[in-house]
Amino acid sequence: MSTEGPSLASSPAISPLAFLSAPVTPGTLAEATDPLPMLIALACIFLLLATCLLFMTLCKPAALDPSRRRAHECMPHHPGSPSEPQLRLWKRLGSLRLSLHSFRHGRPTVPRQPLPGPEDNRSHCDYMESTKM
């Protein structure tokens, strides 16, 4: 009977970085040479960079535009502004939205007039007399 605990030789301690120095078996070698995950990762990185480049070229953020070092309005009112076509586009889209809304709900109806009360009886008679000949 031994009074000491389990020996370290019988149960090796697993290091957090043990997978880096683990011997390569034939099964893991095939997984390591599979290029599909690497190609997917490269494609995602490429798409992310291309999207950023496209945004920078098309939208031209004010922080990157050297001609706009001074303070400026968000919605310029001068006609030579490059953002005016976008404003026209938003107006057209708003008009389209309103026309689709009115098409779905039909034409607006004329608000109904309340029925004439006893105090309106005289004006109703005047109206009837003016139409009779």
Curated annotation (Swiss-Prot):
Location within or outside the cell: Membrane
Gene Ontology cellular-component terms listed: membrane
Bias type Basic and acidic residues, positions: 119-133
Entry keyword Membrane: yes
Superkingdom assignment: Eukaryota
Region (Disordered): 105-133
Database matches in Pfam families: DUF5527
Matches recorded under InterPro entries: DUF5527
Membrane topology per record: Single-pass membrane protein
Residue ranges of the TM segments: 36-56
Coiled-coil intervals, chain numbering: none
Keywords on record: Membrane, Transmembrane, Transmembrane helix
Alphabetized PANTHER family for the sequence: GENE, 17455-RELATED, MCG55969
Protein name in the entry: Uncharacterized protein C10orf105
Organism: Homo sapiens
Taxonomy of the source species: Eukaryota, Metazoa, Chordata, Craniata, Vertebrata
